């Protein structure tokens, strides 16, 4: 059996390899810059030269809209001589490595088998580097390492690090801290003897109350943040704006109900990368192989007597459905109060990526272990082939 150090090191190696591919694109041209960064980060060049973009309405707006934690980090980097655009191209490497480390650790909390941790990080890196989120260096790029850190420390019952990661999450990407808060609440309940029961652990209850109070106070700063750019667009206004129509720039209100609720940008419940366009320009739901593996995990656990690794699954597994329930709940709430809680898809697309990467890694490792039981060590080649294919 290969050591935990080997699989952890291999996870780091793959994260670095993905980073190298990203760097080739990021530094491929003198004027190369990620699309979201072009809007949300360029204004931070003012930290290096305060005379830039004088009276520029859009730059002023993005400066106002950027979370203070992100702006402070970029400002700190500019103070040590790293301008915003250069730092924007470098920070995704660190974000990817931290996400990989915490994903590996979370996976091992659920199934203490190093192979499961490696496969989970491999799936996660595929998801992250094929999207623009991590590479953008914008607030949602910081979501992944911070949310995974929160989950890891929550599973470890490490109170201070967990609370710290929750606070950072609130300052960097507010929508995700609502999902995290929902997870905290759900963990206070358990299903026992066909009844829903509240935990009697006073430590958990106190931690949940304190965490929710801290999050509430931080979110209040966003609620009462003064604005020179008018109020948030209302649902009635959005329905009459062509930009929000199916063919508009935002395309929120899709005419097909199924597409609107599943794969449509901003309104659909699934990540955009799980969907493809058909020849008639209607979006359909597409399941990548690792997503199918994640969906197969409950089936594998139902037949747990046939899988020897199932005995090593810990109670930490419940964190995955808790994340899903919290994400879906806030997705529906966001739809109910459209645009007051930002965009509905923000509450599910990132958490689904994380949950299915971990679930898929655990499921595949259990299947590979079963193959080894059937065919001996020679079938490990088949398992490796499956991983590469996926």
Predicted segments with their positions:
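Membrane-interface transmembrane helices that cradle and orient dolichyl/undecaprenyl
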Residues: 142, 147-161
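Hydrophobic/aromatic-rich transmembrane helices and adjacent perimembrane loops
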Residues: 340-375
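Active-site lumenal/periplasmic loops and adjacent helix-entry segments of GT-C-fold
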Residues: 7-145, 174
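Hydrophobic core segments of transmembrane alpha-helices in multi-pass, intramembrane catalytic enzymes
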Residues: 139-148, 179, 183, 349-357
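Transmembrane catalytic cores of multi-pass membrane glycosyltransferases
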Residues: 22-37, 48-55, 61-62, 174-181, ...
């Amino acid at each position: 059996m290969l050591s935990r150090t080997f699989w952890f090191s291999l996870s780091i190696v793959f994260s670095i390899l993905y980073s190298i591919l990203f760097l080739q694109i990021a530094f491929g041209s003198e004027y190369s810059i990620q699309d979201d960064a072009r809007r949300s980060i360029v204004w931070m060049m003012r930290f290096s030269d305060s005379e830039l973009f004088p009276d520029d309405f859009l730059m002023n707006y993005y400066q106002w809209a950027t979370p203070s934690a992100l702006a402070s980090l970029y400002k700190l980097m500019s103070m040590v001589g790293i301008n915003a655009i250069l730092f924007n191209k470098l920070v995704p490497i660190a974000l990817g490595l931290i996400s990989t480390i915490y994903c590996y650790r979370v996976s091992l909390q659920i199934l203490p088998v190093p192979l499961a941790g490696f496969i989970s990080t491999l799936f996660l890196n595929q998801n992250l580097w094929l999207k623009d989120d991590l590479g953008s260096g914008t607030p949602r790029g910081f979501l992944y390492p911070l949310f995974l850190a929160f989950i890891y420390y929550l599973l470890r019952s490490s109170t201070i690090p967990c609370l710290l990661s929750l606070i950072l999450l609130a300052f960097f990407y507010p929508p995700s801290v609502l999902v995290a808060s929902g997870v905290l609440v759900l963990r206070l309940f358990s299903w026992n003897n066909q009844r829903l029961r509240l935990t009697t652990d006073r430590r958990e209850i106190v931690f949940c109350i304190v965490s929710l109070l801290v999050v509430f106070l931080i979110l209040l700063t966003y609620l009462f943040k003064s604005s020179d750019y008018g109020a948030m667009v209302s649902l009635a206004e959005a329905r009459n704006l062509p930009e929000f129509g199916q063919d508009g720039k935002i395309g929120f209100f899709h005419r097909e109900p199924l597409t609107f609720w599943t794969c449509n940008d901003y309104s659909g419940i699934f990540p955009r990368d799980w969907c493809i366009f058909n020849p008639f320009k209607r979006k359909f739901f597409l399941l990548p192989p690792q997503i199918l593996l994640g969906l197969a995990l409950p089936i594998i656990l139902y037949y747990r007597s046939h899988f020897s690794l199932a005995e090593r699954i810990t109670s930490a597994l419940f964190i995955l459905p808790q994340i899903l329930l919290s994400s879906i709940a806030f997705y529906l709430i966001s739809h109910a109060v459209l645009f007051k809680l930002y965009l509905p898809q923000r509450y599910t697309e990132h958490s689904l990526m994380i949950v299915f990467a971990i679930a898929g890694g655990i499921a595949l490792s259990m299947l590979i272990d079963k193959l080894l039981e059937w065919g001996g060590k020679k079938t490990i080649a088949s398992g490796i082939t499956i991983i590469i294919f996926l």
